From Swiss-Prot:
Record has Phosphoprotein as a keyword: yes
Family label: Belongs to the retinoblastoma protein (RB) family.
Official protein name in the record: Retinoblastoma-associated protein
Disordered, as annotated region: 1-36, 341-360, 872-921
Source species of the chain: Mus musculus (Mouse)
Length: 921
């Protein structure tokens, strides 16, 4: 039964506003347990006998069975949904039973028992479940099971291959009749499952689980006869196990010998070398977690190996308690645990950078474990040479500050370390405290490394060494440290390889909660972090970009976010329209926004950026510098302007994708929807408080379609939205209506969105609609290259600026390394090089122009434009002309400035026309 809330909302509205959608458009009508009536009916007369038999087999209580049958009736009655699957009633019945059991918190069966009853695999089950609108509780249960399955599947495949490399399948010695490779595999896998459940609170941590599995493998190699082992494990095991001629059966292993076996690390060192694992981390897991577990297990047979039956009985207890997957079935290659043949989890590939002079290398498939290990190894290469303490260069920067920040920085790092260690242990397991300490040390190394790179970049840009304000800013340091830790945490998890929502419990925004850091403050450091750390992998850059998107779409809009205070201050200072970015949305987002700009703005403002084009005239430069230091108006926030511009681009990109799927027959509506969408974000930003960007997008689309008489139901919008790669069902099922009250997105549209924007929406039905907002320029990838150069269409030509040509000397801007003309630097036919290379190329181009002009005219070459030399009073001109009187010199410079400005303005106008024409196309 659909909810009645939309009807009540519609009845309260006057006739003029656009009509609300009918009740059947509610996309959440079958998503929650509260929407299904539980009236006592004679279900035995309605339900099919096979359904009743299935429920009896699974021992499903009557009220769960009734709920499951109602869910089935609703699923089977929806037009188009699960088309082709309705005939497979048994599978869908099982899914409906699962939904009802989860919603009612009554699960009398395990997930594997349900699978066996309906004869389906994990992936087939979840593929069908995704097609049904379910509650958030069911979504979470499904996500948890799927993540656990993925990790177990990857680990078992890895263990199976590892055992094949360690053990001989047909050993020549007769001593191994009681101990063979299959027996060791079974014992190792079940022991690992028990250890994982005992040691780790997180079920989906792939790296620590794999390290624990290596400990299990090491332990049972020590108890295996050398005749069963391959090299190099056989050589490493002989000093422990004795001569290969020594019979193993019946050996009396004293406590002293057992202790020696525990403390011997030769085999585990070989394992770590073979799998490229960090030996210190694995040893820590071995001594702090695995040895205490194995000693508490207390099950040992005469030959030193635990009995399979005893281990299996213990695991049975854990499995029945958790009511999820029976991972022992991996040993039998059971069809319920078969993987999807096209599943990317099993065939992930690690990108390989090819030498352009060589033929393209064939990229070989990697397992998830191998991929994560490679990523960790790349991080280790960067940080192995780094220090846990500030370098001499950093200390030099600290000493140059008005207020030396060193003591506060060291104290902050120490205090945060204690907090991180505690939170990590709470999330992963108390036995993993030392692992948390190791991860934190890596994060601190990266923190100091990136900080030093940032300061070097700022020094080159501004020609100053006193960064007292920035280095004494607590939020800057917490954000930079959080970003470094996020890189480390993501490297050790699979979240770098998939969407954030399917990451581990330590995935973003976990680090923000640990450090009590606001998402908007964290966002400020992401771009600078990526630009200055050139060794970040492509996957890590994508991960940080996803973090940035997550912040822009929802996390920055939480009630306690500093974003709202910044918006209020900005509006109070400069009026309601100042949220528009300074540069047009149709132009690329270029410019070297640094951490100093973001964290000290608007307390400090570098030169005011009024254009993102790469060519600036001397007059423009002079005007920008003067306005930055002499304006009396309140300074705009660089961080706010850049944030809004990025939000607009993310918003339009998603809207464009949705319109392409739903409104291909009405392309003119996209621009109108965008105008309403952008107006809401700019002027009705309170609607974003504790809400999601996509909620405003879908409401904007529906409102414009209604007022333009386009038949587009809200449910169709939601169905298309669910197919977007970043979409989550909670976005449209659980929308804030008012304080602590949540409902579906259609209720939000009727009771909140339309009420606030009623007048504005109706304007689009009039003969004089509002002026359409400009379409943002969408770059292919904002972080594709660290310096974000601009590529000119039609050729392999890139234009990129050097550092800022100004330094601050006694409050006045003065040129340092560049003049206005030398900012135009071109690289042709090659990748991006150093600034010196750009300067040489630029000089060559200028000289070529002069030679061509001289040969064409047959006379003396024209004098080049003179470079303005504000820093040296009375210096000779660049062309070697003699010294002129001050008045004549001033007039000459003024003429040059006017000429240059005119030329650049014409060039800008032509470029703007080109951009506009491209956007219209």
């Amino acid at each position: 039964m659909p909810p009645k809330a939309p009807r009540r909302a519609a009845a309260a509205e006057p006739p003029p506003p656009p009509p609300p959608p009918p009740r059947e458009d509610d996309p959440a009508q079958d998503s929650g347990p509260e929407e299904l009536p539980l009236a006592r009916l004679e279900f035995e007369e309605i339900e099919e006998p096979e359904f009743i038999a299935l429920c009896q087999k699974l021992k499903v209580p009557d009220h769960v069975r009734e709920r499951a049958w109602l869910t089935w009736e609703k699923v089977s009655s929806v037009d188009g949904i699960l088309e082709g699957y309705i005939q497979k009633k048994k599978e869908l019945w099982g899914i409906c039973i699962f939904i009802a059991a989860v919603d009612l918190d009554e699960m009398p069966f395990t997930f594997t028992e349900l699978q066996k009853s309906i004869e389906t695999s994990v992936y087939k089950f979840f593929d069908l479940l995704k097609e049904i609108d379910t509650s958030t509780k069911v979504d979470n249960a499904m996500s948890r099971l799927l993540k656990k399955y993925n990790v177990l599947c990857a680990l078992y495949s890895k263990l199976e291959r590892t055992c094949e490399l360690i053990y001989l399948t047909q050993p020549s010695s007769a001593l191994s009749t009681e101990i063979n490779s299959m027996l060791v595999l079974k014992i190792s896998w079940i022991t690992f499952l028990l250890a994982k459940g005992e040691v780790l609170q997180m079920e989906d941590d792939l790296v620590i689980s794999f390290q624990l599995m290596l400990c299990v493998v090491d332990y049972f190699i020590k108890f295996s006869p050398p005749a069963l082992l391959r090299e190099p494990y056989k050589t490493a095991a002989i000093p422990i196990n004795g001569s290969p001629r020594t019979p193993r059966r019946g050996q009396n292993r004293s406590a002293r010998i057992a202790k020696q076996l525990e403390n011997d690390t030769r085999i585990i060192e070989v394992l770590c070398k073979e799998h490229e694992c960090n030996i210190d981390e694995v040893k820590n897991v071995y001594f702090k977690n695995f040895i205490p577990f194995i000693n508490s297990l207390g099950i040992v047979s005469s030959n030193g190996l635990p009995e399979v039956e005893s281990l299996s009985k213990r695991y049975e207890e854990v499995y029945l308690k958790n009511k999820d997957l029976d991972a022992r079935l991996f040993l039998d290659h059971d069809k319920t645990l078969q993987t999807d043949p096209i599943d990317s989890f099993e065939t992930e590939r690690t990108p390989r950078k090819n030498n352009p002079d060589e033929e393209a290398n064939v990229v070989t498939p990697h397992t998830p474990v191998r991929t994560v290990m490679n990523t960790i190894q790349q991080l280790m290469v960067i940080l192995n040479s780094a220090s846990d303490q500030p370098s001499e260069n950093l200390i030099s920067y600290f000493n140059n500050c008005t207020v030396n920040p060193k003591e506060n920085i060291l104290k902050r790092v120490k205090d945060v370390g204690h907090i991180f260690k505690e939170k990590f242990a709470n999330a992963v397991g108390q036995g993993c405290v030392d692992i948390g300490v190791q991860r934190y040390k890596l994060g601190v190394r990266l923190y100091y490394r990136v900080m030093e790179s940032m300061l070097k970049s700022e020094e080159e840009r501004l020609s100053i060494q006193n960064f007292s304000k920035l280095l004494n800013d607590n939020i800057f340091h917490m954000s930079l440290l959080a970003c470094a830790l996020e890189v480390v945490m993501a490297t050790y998890s699979r979240s770098t390889l998939q969407h954030l929502d399917s990451g581990t419990d330590l995935s973003f925004p976990w680090i923000l909660n640990v450090l009590n850091l606001k998402a908007f403050d964290f966002y400020k450091v992401i771009e600078s972090f990526i630009k200055v750390e050139a060794n970040l992998t492509r996957e890590m850059i994508k991960h940080l970009e996803r973090c940035e998107h997550r912040i822009m779409e929802s996390l920055a809009w939480l009630s306690d976010s500093p974003l709202f205070d910044l918006i209020k201050q900005s509006k109070d200072g400069e009026g309601p329209d100042n949220l528009e970015p300074a540069c047009p949305l149709s132009l690329p987002l270029q410019g070297n926004h640094t951490a100093a700009d973001m964290y000290l703005s608007p307390l400090r403002s570098p030169k005011k950026r009024t254009s993102t084009t790469r060519v600036n005239s001397a007059a423009n430069t002079e005007t920008q510098a003067a306005s930055a230091f002499h304006t009396q108006k309140p300074l705009k926030s660089t961080s706010l302007a850049l944030f809004y511009k990025k939000v607009y681009r993310l918003a339009y990109l998603r809207l464009n994708t949705l319109c392409a799927r739903l409104l291909s027959d009405h392309p003119e509506l996209e621009h109108i929807i965008w105008t309403l969408f952008q107006h809401t974000l700019q002027n009705e930003y309170e609607l974003m408080r504790d809400r999601h960007l996509d909620q405003i997008m879908m409401c904007s689309m529906y409102g414009i379609c209604k007022v333009k008489n386009i038949d587009l139901k809200f449910k169709i919008i939601v169905t298309a939205y669910k197919d977007l790669p970043h979409a989550a069902q909670e976005t449209f099922k659980r929308v804030l209506i008012r304080e602590e009250e949540f409902d579906s997105i259609i209720v939000f549209y009727n009771s909140v969105f339309m009420q606030r924007l009623k007048t504005n929406i109706l304007q689009y039905a009039s003969t004089r609609p509002p002026t359409l907002s400009p379409i943002p320029h969408i770059p292919r990838s904002p972080y594709k290259f660290s310096s974000s150069p601009l590529r000119i269409p039609g050729g392999n030509i890139y234009i990129s600026p050097l550092k800022s040509p100004y330094k601050i000397s006694e409050g006045l801007p003065t040129p340092t390394k560049m003049t206005p003309r030398s900012r135009i630097l071109v690289s042709i036919g090659e990748s991006f090089g150093t600034s010196e290379k750009f300067q040489k190329i630029n000089q060559m181009v200028c000289n070529s122009d002069r030679v061509l002009k001289r040969s064409a005219e047959g006379g003396n070459p024209p004098k080049p434009l003179k470079k303005l030399r504000f820093d040296i009073e009375g210096a000779d001109e660049a062309d070697g002309s003699k010294h002129l009187p001050a008045e004549s010199k001033f007039q000459q410079k003024l003429a040059e400035m006017t000429s240059t400005r005119t030329r650049m303005q014409k060039q800008r106008m032509n470029e703007s026309k080109d951009v506009s024409n491209k956007e219209e196309k």
